[in-house]
């Protein structure tokens, strides 16, 4: 309690996922309930310890197999960090900067508006209306989906949005991992003249060879990583995926990948491979990533202004 009031930490997992309620109720929350206080509290006895709680959650878990459990742990982890910062009575981004960063934080980060999904009957004018609504909110960079229509039609969609946003650096495209290598390269060759901000998740996120081959033929920025759920998978992307530290973007989502405790390990790994944290723009559009970006010098954050409510609504104010 603070000043007699109960303090509650809130956590939720990322967009576009099935709920992990059963994993939470039957596997992870019971471990917390059964843990001794010393295994949950920091050594000073002044606050909860995210690292200790994470260790309790992961006890007896085998390595590898980073699937739905990573999201369940990430959901609890988010609530823990929210609780910790409230007990400290400082914004989470400030707490992260002071404890895990260089003490420097910012109140302003780069944010882009994601959307541009395919829907039955959604034509190019409707796509443009959606993108214009994001520009009207003050966003300068937007993202749209590709791969759900034939290449020729997708190119028309892209060119229409480019006329609206004015420059390729203001537009990202996302294939959601749907392409094989031939299609990924074909799209890349067709889109290269547009000089887009990035070409996202062309193929399966674990197909590092595909990503590496694409990087040899597509000279503009690539982006991927939202569906890599551990430090080890993220490291394999950097080792084998052909990602270029000067131009490409990493999109690891802390909520999907065991939470911020694991994310800190991923950021440390990146530093060991001479990757700047500014090359990370997390997937998901949730407030934890926003605080991480502001407190640990990431490159920005994703937001879904009109989707995934209520969680997509936090930029409203």
Please place each PLM-identified region on the residue numbering:
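Generic detector of well-ordered alpha-helical packing
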Residues: 78, 83, 144-146, 175-176, ...
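Conserved, mostly hydrophobic/aromatic
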Residues: 6, 76, 89, 142, ...
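Shared catalytic-loop signature of beta/alpha-barrel
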Residues: 189, 206-317
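Metal-dependent enolase-superfamily TIM-barrel catalytic cores that perform enediolate-based chemistry
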Residues: 98-218
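Flexible, glycine/charged-enriched surface loops at secondary-structure junctions
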Residues: 40, 95, 145, 198-202, ...
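Metal- or metallocofactor-binding catalytic centers and their adjacent structured scaffolds
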Residues: 2-87
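Generic secondary-structure signature for well-ordered alpha-helical cores
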Residues: 4, 29, 33, 37, ...
